């Protein structure tokens, strides 16, 4: 045992060690040290500010440079900068070649054709179903239904099951403010027409993530369905659906959970068997093929076998291969869900393209995908911070505004009154159950403001996809996108079919949306930031001249 002065020195060293980090700074304050007491464990973290240029291993950049070579779109459009992959992704050569090959050599309709060409087309069509099951690692008895996209899929799911589930006025359907209109309007239409059921909205926390604890406390025995997106198509937040599903099912196992995976499927590898083992598997999962590098007009629905055995689903359309017997006044239908919901002639080459796309995805290193997309995401913030700062001298009333920590909001509020009303409590709740913290509140200034809505929650283990919405109260989002188009840059403006998110969470009418994918490059990110900064400056000057 140590005694005397030596023991005292060691004791003082460990007592004051955490506080010593508080005074460590380099000359330009580029590092922020987050320090916690050493008594709580070695939890000292180093975080780079937005002034610090992000880094990634060069071999990962080279890896995705090689992946990009598989996309002929970029060879044919060398001067075009494409940042609209949340709307649709480009197609690798193997997908384009397969669709062309079908029309050249294999063109035939499926099912009921006895001749060899039709038989082969049917087999190849059904193989895609097996490819999807293998890719998402689901069971053989689980259902995969082909659709023409997520909008159709969400409508099909609502209409085929709502009469079975929503039978009383007090029955509840939970949605979120982040939902695409196709996951809101079908539920609204049924409720307004039939006068049964009611819609409630899940509470969001300060960062745009679902407040799970509050959600569970709001639910009850009358809650029948929760239908939410895995990733927002506007702010890019990836919800922790496994945690959400597990907690809901533990308390209310009867609730049907529907996940819209339109934005997430191209960025996240799903493992249904693992989710089932952890009791965190959705009952239904819906996605679009064209958003994971397959053809336009394609998609699929996953329906858990446990759900399909419990309910009798209705077809949305009648005719074609869903009929087993037709009499003068009554008809009988098939029981197979895939046959029941795939009425009429399908987009056969498009469905085949989904299989080829997933075979292409199997070769992608998914450990690299998230790292690379977040590197590009951070690189954009870095360059925007750099180039917009250059404009501060010329245009002092233009602010680059983040949802950022370590800001003295109390003094800021005295000179920049916010649009939002705060109460005296630590958190506030508006009329729409959206909670936000004072310390991370986005500031809507009375002065000219340019905002990038980004709240970096990765240090808390909450993930994002590479989507960044921009907004200015000085100029229109549509003007920004139009002028960027003159510079061969493709980004999207509007409410992106998510008007509730804009109205109740972002509190703006529309945004300009940048969506990043693994075929984008650091050079494109730099050019994008340069042009947004210069275009914003120009649009401000145009306004000031009026």
Curated annotation (Swiss-Prot):
Pathway: Cofactor biosynthesis; iron-sulfur cluster biosynthesis
GO terms classed as biological process: cysteine metabolic process
Coiled coil: none
Compartmental location: Plastid, Apicoplast
GO terms, molecular function: cysteine desulfurase activity
Signal sequence region: 1-22
UniProt cofactor(s): pyridoxal 5'-phosphate
Post-translational modifications reported in the UniProt record: Proteolytically cleaved.
KW Zinc-finger (keyword) present: no
Active site positions: 497 (cysteine persulfide intermediate)
Keywords: Apicoplast, Plastid, Pyridoxal phosphate, Signal, Transferase
Modified residues (N6-(pyridoxal phosphate)lysine): 291
Pfam family, any one: Aminotran_5
Database matches in InterPro entries: Aminotrans_V_dom, PyrdxlP-dep_Trfase, PyrdxlP-dep_Trfase_major, PyrdxlP-dep_Trfase_small
EC number: 2.8.1.7
UniProt function note: Catalyzes sulfur activation and mobilization in sulfur mobilization (SUF) pathway for iron-sulfur (Fe-S) cluster biogenesis. Active when in complex with a partner protein SufE. Required for apicoplast maintenance. Plays a role in the development of sporozoites in oocysts in mosquitoes. May provide sulfur for MNMA-mediated tRNA modifications.
Family: Belongs to the class-V pyridoxal-phosphate-dependent aminotransferase family. Csd subfamily.
Oligomeric and partner information: Monomer. Interacts with SufE; interaction enhances cysteine desulfurase activity of SufS.
Note: Dose-dependent inhibition of catalytic activity by d-cycloserine (DCS) was observed in the presence of SufE. Compounds related to DCS may therefore show antimalarial activity.
Protein name: Cysteine desulfurase SufS
Organism name: Plasmodium falciparum (isolate 3D7)
Gene: SufS
């Amino acid at each position: 045992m140590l005694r005397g002065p030596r023991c005292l020195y060691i004791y003082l060293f460990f007592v004051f060690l955490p506080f010593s980090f508080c005074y460590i700074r380099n000359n330009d304050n580029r590092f922020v040290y987050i320090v916690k007491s050493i008594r709580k464990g070695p939890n000292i973290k180093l975080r780079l500010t937005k002034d610090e240029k992000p880094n990634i291993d060069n071999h990962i950049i080279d890896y995705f440079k090689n992946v990009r070579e598989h996309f002929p779109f970029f060879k044919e459009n060398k001067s075009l900068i494409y940042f609209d992959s949340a709307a649709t992704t480009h197609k690798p050569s193997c997908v384009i070649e397969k669709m062309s090959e079908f029309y050249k050599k294999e063109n035939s309709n499926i099912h009921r054709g006895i001749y060899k060409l039709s038989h082969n087309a049917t087999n190849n069509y059904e193989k895609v179903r097996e490819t999807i099951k293998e890719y998402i690692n689901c069971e053989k008895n689980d259902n995969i239904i082909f659709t023409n996209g997520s909008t159709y899929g969400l409508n099909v799911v609502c209409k085929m099951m709502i009469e079975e589930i929503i039978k009383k006025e007090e029955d509840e359907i939970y949605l979120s403010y982040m939902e695409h209109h196709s996951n809101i309007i079908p539920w609204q239409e049924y409720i307004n027409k039939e006068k049964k059921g009611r819609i409630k909205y899940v509470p969001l926390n300060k960062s745009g993530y679902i407040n799970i604890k509050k959600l569970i406390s709001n639910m009850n025995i009358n809650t029948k369905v929760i239908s939410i997106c895995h990733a927002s198509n506007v702010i890019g937040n990836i919800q922790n659906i496994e945690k959400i599903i597990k907690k809901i099912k533990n308390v209310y196992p009867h609730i049907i959970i529907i996940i819209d995976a339109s934005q997430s499927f191209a960025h996240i590898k799903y493992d249904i068997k693992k989710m089932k083992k952890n009791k965190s598997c959705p009952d239904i999962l819906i996605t679009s093929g064209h958003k994971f590098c397959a053809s336009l007009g394609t998609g699929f629905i996953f329906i858990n076998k446990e759900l399909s055995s419990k309910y009798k689903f209705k077809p949305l359309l009648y005719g074609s291969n869903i009929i087993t017997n037709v009499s003068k006044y009554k008809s009988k239908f098939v029981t197979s869900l895939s046959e029941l919901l795939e009425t009429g002639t399908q987009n056969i080459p498009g469905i085949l393209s989904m299989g080829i796309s997933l075979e292409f995805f199997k070769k992608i290193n998914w450990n690299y995908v998230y790292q690379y997309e977040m590197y590009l995401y951070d690189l954009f913030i870095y360059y925007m911070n750099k180039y917009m700062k250059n404009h501060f001298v010329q245009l002092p009333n233009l602010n680059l505004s983040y949802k950022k920590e370590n800001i003295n909001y109390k003094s800021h509020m005295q000179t920049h009154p916010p649009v939002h009303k705060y109460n005296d409590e630590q958190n506030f709740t508006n009329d729409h159950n959206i909670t936000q913290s004072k310390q991370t509140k986005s500031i809507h200034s009375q002065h000219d403001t340019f905002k990038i809505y980004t709240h970096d929650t990765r240090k808390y283990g909450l993930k994002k996809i590479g989507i960044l919405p921009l907004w200015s109260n000085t100029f229109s989002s549509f003007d920004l996108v139009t002028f960027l188009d003159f510079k061969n840059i493709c980004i999207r403006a509007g409410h992106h079919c998510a008007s509730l998110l804009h109205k109740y969470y972002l509190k703006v009418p529309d945004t300009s949306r940048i969506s990043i994918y693994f075929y984008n490059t650091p050079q494109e990110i730099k050019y994008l930031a340069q042009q947004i900064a210069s275009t914003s400056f120009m649009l401000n000057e145009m306004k000031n001249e009026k």
